[in-house]
Each structure stands twice: as structure tokens, then as C-alpha cells.
Amino acid sequence: MKKGAMQKSKQWNVKGAVRLASVFHFLHSCGSGCLLPFLTLYFRHLGLSAAMIGIIMASKHLLALLWRPFSSVLARQYDKRRTVIVGSLLSSALVVLPLLLFPSAGILVESGRCNTSQPDADPTLPLAVIEQMTVPVGSNATVYSVNQTSVSTNQTLEDNTLVNHSRSARGLRSLKKEEEPHSEFLGSLKVMDAQHQMFFLVLLVTALWEFVAVPLEWTADDGLYEYLDFVDATDRHSGVKVWKHVGAAFGSCLVGVLVTNLFCRIGNSVEFYSYTVLMILTVPASALLPIYLRKRERPTSGGFKALQLVHGNPQAILCAVTVILTGMVTSAVSDFLLWLMQDCGAMEIHMGICLALAHLSHTGFSPIAGPLSRFLKYHGWMLVLAVVGLAMQCLYYSFLWSPWAVMPAQLLAGFSTGALWWSVTSQSEDIATPGTEKTILRLFEAFSLDMGAALGSLIAGFVVQKFGVNVLFQGASVMLAVWSSALAVLKWKIPRQRRINYSRLLAADTEVSESESDQEKDWLETAMEDDRRNNKWTVNKS
């Protein structure tokens, strides 16, 4: 019996579980930081326009919005969480590599870095004519597209016609039904110019990559949360998020240094290879990741319940609108800030350090969040400050004059993001019923990181295509400034409704009772002793 108890206590090792989860999220975030922030730069290198890149990124976010919660539910229902995590790591590491096979359809500002001409660097395009495209005002970059000659297209069609006529009539009839959809697909590709062909292929690969990569985060997070919840240690779960930001900062800085030093040898492929290597290195950590499956099933209407709670609270509705708007602006910044830095002469090392600074400043917000919240006396005012900070950040970006000048704005970006999610977390706790806190917080995350990000990427792509990056950031700053003023007035006018959370009250009462000295007695024991003394005094008197 004693041996079984020892095995059980060894099995539920909370500190070890948190350490393993921290290592896992550090490696995974490090790999993501090596590639995701630089993805739009690589698409620009391929010759895609800003509008095309906006459509690709918007499709990526929309796919995540739909597939992430559904895949998380399926992994839990069939008890395949670890399989999903390992499969997602390996698949995403391999699926992203075909993007390196696409030849560059453009000559960008970095073409003069290695003292070699760009046409010589792309010998795979002998039948192409490089035509310069008009760049919107406000951008210093020159983008080129590649259009195939009509001679090569007509020659290909003639060759296909000869081959088709050489087949027998019976063979044509049998192949017509089988290859008609395939022929229509290839025919539509042949009609497109080289730039649209590139856009269509990149969109397919990116969608497939997102499909295999997106189930990992929620699946791993759910397994750890339920593991800690089983042993009443969910307060340790928030400590894991810090390592996500540290890993992303390390990955961005590392790949910036590597690309800057190895660009003339292997070009932009360093980012992809770094991502693949780190995803594979994360697999052993995922095999040891603590995952627990509850025997009882959760209610399937958790998402609808969270929507009802948000819809029924005016303050929560304001918070939802705010996270959608901030998600739009944050997505636009993440997609096109590096474009602006590249136009100012920045190299990847500048970009990596600036991205790392934003992540580290986000982690540095936690120590001051408590005192700042007590000073403001209401977390809703911190939400207003976050919107104001993001507006100032975008305005600063629009007047960027050198690569290193972005660093003050990156410091402000980390604090603005930290203040935003601190306020959102507090708002989720205010309206949550027991067991719905995490679901409501994820609903706000989906509003911001998926829905808002999709709208922001789509709109930002067309704005940059038409007016330039500077106008994009100025417009985002004006929009956030107007909303921050309206938000402050509405926060002041709308009464605050806070639901009583009995689980938090019980936890607070437990902490208070544990901090009391042993000499102090429970109120029930004191009342019983007083009653006994009163009864004894009455008996003696009689």
C-alpha cells in the first residue's frame, strides 16, 4: 500500500510537469519565432504584391479560426492528444519546405548585398521577361514581376495538341472523364501570369501548413491545464506562458543573426531550415509532455455558453470590440512592419533584435501589472491605456527614419500588449461562471488573434498596395485614437457588472486561513466555546 502511494505521488509531479511544459513551449515558440515574423518578407522576395500577401495571411488566420477549436475537441474526444502534437510538429516541419522550391519572381532591395546580379542568381527562369511594376508612394522598394512570353505559352499549347491527336479515339474518350477536372485546373494555371501562378501555389502550401500546424497549441495547452487541474495546481499554468515569449524572442534574434551572416551563401532559406530543425527538436519534449484526459466529459456547449456570457455583459462587449480592433492593427503591424524596416535599410539582425525586444518587454509587464491595476482601481482603464499605447506605437512607425529607431516603439508594443491581455483576463474572470474562465479567455483570443487578424491582414494588404505602408500605420493610429476616446466614455457611462465567483472566494478564504497563526481559532469553535460557557454559567446560577 505504501509503495502504491509512493508511485502515485511520483506520478503527479507538478514541478516536473511545469518544467517539461516550459521546455516544450520554449522550443516550439523558438521555432515559430524563426520563421513566422519573417514570412511576409519572404513572400515579398518571391515577387508577390502587398494585396496578395494580405489575402494569403488572411486565409491563414481564417483557417486557424475554424480548425483550431474543432481539432482540439477531436483530439480530446478520441484521446489522441499526444499523437496530434507529435504529428503536427513533424508535418509542419516538412510541409513548409516546398516554399523554398519556388523561384524568386522579383528583384528586391537586398539584391545588391552580395555583389552579384539577381538574374544570375535565378537561372531557373530562362524564358521570362522581367518587367518593373509601379510601387505606391511611400515605399522605397522596387518590386518586379515575371511574365512568361506568349511564344512559350503558344508552343506549349501546340505540343499538347499534337500529343492529344496522337492518341487513339478510345483512349481520349476514357481519359476525358478522368482528366477533365485536372485539365481544367492546369489550364487555369496556364492562363495566369507568373505572379498569379506564384500566388496560387503559395496560398495552397500556406493553407496546408496552417492546417497541420494549428492544432498543436490548444491541444498541448488543454492537456497541461487538465493535468494541473486534477491536482489543484492551475495557478502554475500561467508561468508557462512566459517561456513562450522568451522562446519567440530567442528564435527571432537567433535567426536574425544567422540570416545576416549567411545570406550571401544560402539566402533566406536559413529561416525555414531553422524552423524545421527546432520543430524536430521539440518532438522528444512532446513525448514527455504531461497530458491528462478527464474521465468525465465536458459540456459540448462551452463555446456557446461563453458567447452568451459575453453578449449579456456590456463591458464584455466593449472588450470584445476592442480586441477585434487591436487584433486588426497588430496583424497589420506584424505583416508590414518589416517591409518598412527593410525600406529604411534594415537587415535581418535589426529586425530580429527589435522583435525580441517586444517579446521581452511583454514579459516584463507582469511585475508592474499588479501595482498599476491597484493604482487605476479598475482593469477597464488599463484596456484604454493599452489602446492608446498601440495608437502611439503605430503613429511612431509611420515616421520611422532608421532601423534602430524602431526600438522605443517595440518597448511600448510589449507593454501595450501586456496591458491589453491583463485587462482581458480580468474581464473574463468578472463574467465567468465556474468552469468557463478558460473558455471565455480563449473566445477573446479567437476574436483578436484570428478574426481580427484576418480582417487586419486583408485590409492592410490592399491599403499598402494602394497608398503605402506609412499611410497604413497612420490610418491605424487614427482609428485606435478615436476608439480609445469612445471606449473611455463608454467605460465611464456603462455600469460595471461583476459576477460572484465562489471558487475564487473559496481560494482567497483558504489563503487567509492558512496565513493565520495557530493561536487564532476558527469562528465556529469560538462560538461553540462561548455557548458552552454561557450554558455553564446558567447551570451554576440555577
Swiss-Prot record:
Locations listed in the record: Membrane
GO CC annotations, alphabetized: membrane
Pfam families associated with the record: MFS_1_like
Keywords, comma-separated and alphabetical: Membrane, Transmembrane, Transmembrane helix
Location, primary (coarse class): membrane
Topology term for the membrane: Multi-pass membrane protein
InterPro entries membership: MFS_assoc_dom, MFS_MFSD6, MFS_trans_sf
Residue ranges of the TM segments: 46-66, 89-109, 198-218, 246-266, 272-292, 321-341, 352-372, 381-401, 404-424, 444-464, 469-489
Family membership: Belongs to the major facilitator superfamily. MFSD6 family.
Protein name: Major facilitator superfamily domain-containing protein 6-like
Species of origin: Danio rerio (Zebrafish)
